Regions:
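Structural/interface elements that position substrates and couple domains in central-metabolism enzymes
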Residues: 1-187
Length: 187
């Protein structure tokens, strides 16, 4: 039942849940009742640390790179929408910047991002790594060979498990997928 809504896929790993309705709705459901909500509270706690963990995972992949440049693709809180309210991308970007990375952000749909958005080409240019935070359909169509020509590094962090693995590996990228526990080396 939980995964039947056409706009959600709650069983898919990701960098955190965003948007304005989940934090408000879960608090609203519990407010004014004597009902204990340990599951909701636990889920909110896990969700609050997931963006930090995601940023830290990418930064581990950048070990040994001085002044790393990261292309962050997607700031909307979910795929194929432009809404960037309460997005996990904000925490991820801030944490990467505090760790010393230069972050270039691209989102073709975002209407209310607090970040300076650039074109896809500008985001990828000279980047050591590209991090997919939002699962926009457009991102699935990015040509890995073109990305390789623009980037200085070959690190992909797929935070939504949306990329076809083989073409990215064949273009020389090492791909880490959030939630599958492995890093897939270039072929």
């Amino acid at each position: 039942i939980a995964n039947r809504h056409p706009r959600v896929n709650i069983h898919q790993p990701g960098p955190g849940v965003g948007g304005y309705c989940i934090p408000v709705a879960s608090a609203f459901l519990a407010a004014g009742t004597d009902v204990s909500t340990p599951t909701i509270n636990g889920a909110r706690r896990v969700n609050s640390i997931q963006p930090k963990r995601t940023a830290d995972q990418l930064f581990e992949l950048l070990t040994g790179i001085t002044n790393p440049v990261v292309a962050v693709l997607g700031v909307a809180y979910k795929g194929n929408v432009g809404d960037a309210r309460a997005t996990p991308a904000d925490t991820i970007i801030e944490r990467l910047e505090k760790s010393g990375a230069t972050v270039k952000v691209h989102d073709p749909l975002s209407i209310n991002s607090r970040h300076n958005l650039v074109s896809l080409e500008s985001a990828l240019e000279d980047a050591n790594a590209v991090m997919f935070i939002t699962d926009h359909d457009q991102f699935k169509q990015i040509d890995p060979t073109t990305a390789a020509k623009l980037m200085s590094g070959r690190i992909v962090f797929d935070g939504r498990n949306i990329l076809p693995l083989k073409p990215w590996q064949e273009a020389g990228f090492t791909v880490t997928r959030l939630g599958d526990g492995t890093t897939h080396s270039a072929t």
